[in-house]
Each structure stands twice: as structure tokens, then as C-alpha cells.
Amino acid sequence: MERIVENLAEVEERIARALARSRRHRSEITLIAVTKTFPASATLAAWQAGLRDFGENYVQEFETKSPLLGPLEDARFHLIGHLQSNKVNKAVPLFDCVQTVDSARLAGRLSQSRAGAGLPPLDVMLEVKLSDEESKHGCDPENLAVLVEGVRPLPHLRLLGLMTIPPFFEDPERSRPYFARLRELAVKYELKALSMGMSNDFEAAIEEGATHIRLGTALFGRRTKPAG
């Protein structure tokens, strides 16, 4: 708990400096604590430290972890990993936001499942693939217009904006063009939310207009358990 409090204070200082450079306000940034592969105790400690938004990559992992958390007041859980179609029905009651919608088919299934569960509209973001990495998921920019128009009318989804994961660079400045490109696409399609920036490059993301940053290592330290 003490380490998370200290790390969060350092992160907040870095956020404040990036916001000052870009003449923005703290209220414009949602800090998502990425708790994938960490135990439920880490999520609870982060919540006690004042964090309210949490990111998970794997539906099955969070399905196991969720009952251990109990009711956390004001907590919001974001799915930030690839969502397979066969996991939609499990994901829908677990998450408040799915940031990795990359096809109209997936969006349709989410909307249908949300309706069937009798839940209010699900917040979603569209994941955009801006690199050539085969390991990355997302909609290609040239197909984004069709996806946006396919998702907007769905009655049980609420389209917030765009999300991307650039290649990892030691130099965070190399991520900046990817962030700038996502911002341009958001402006083009009149979308307000931009989920971009992780522990290594979130300051550059904030300077380029991020509204949601996803931080794991900066808050919790390096993971010792392999992802998967």
C-alpha cells in the first residue's frame, strides 16, 4: 500500500508537469491503473490510495479476480486487451468500458449481449492499429470511418473515442507521432476520448491530447508473473 501511494504521488507530479506544458487541466485526464496479472490485493490497495479506474487485459483472469474485490464504490473497470467473440457474454457484466472494439461484428455482439443482460449502455472505444506489428490488434485507419458509422447507432453502446497501443520505444518521443495521428483521427470523426500512453510514454501522450492514460509499472512496479 505504501509503495503504491508513493508511486501514485510521483505519477501525479509527472502528470502535472505534462499538463502544464500543454496548458491542460487535471480534470481532463483519467488515470487507469493497469492491474492485469496483479492480485486482487493490488487493486484494493490502489482503490484505497484513491484510484477509481482499473484496466484488465484478460476476461478470464478478471472473472476470477472480480469476486475477491467485493463492491468497490465508484470503481470502473476497463477491458484494455483483445476481446474474442466467444468471451463477449462473460465480459459484458464485468466491465464498465471496453476499449478494444475493432470490428462492427464485435460491437454488434456487445450491444446485443448488453441488452440481453438488462444493463445500461456499455462505454466503448475503438482500437486503432497505427503500426505494422503483427502482434497488435485494431482497426486500420482506412477502415475506421465504416467502423465508426457502424457503432454509433447501436442502442446499447456509447461510443467515447479511440484507443491505440504504439510500438514500444525506449525513447518516448518516438511514440509521439502515433499519438498525434490518433488525435487527428478523433478530430476527424468528432470523438472526444483518446486512450493512449502507458508508463513509458504517458507524458508525451498527455501533450498530444490523451484523455485516458493506462499505467501499470509506474504504479505497481514490474510484473513478476508472466502475462497470459
Regions found by a protein language model. Give the residues of each.
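Conserved alpha/beta-domain cores
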Residues: 1-200, 206-208, 220-223
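Gly/Pro- and small hydrophobic-enriched strand-loop and loop-to-helix capping segments
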Residues: 210-228
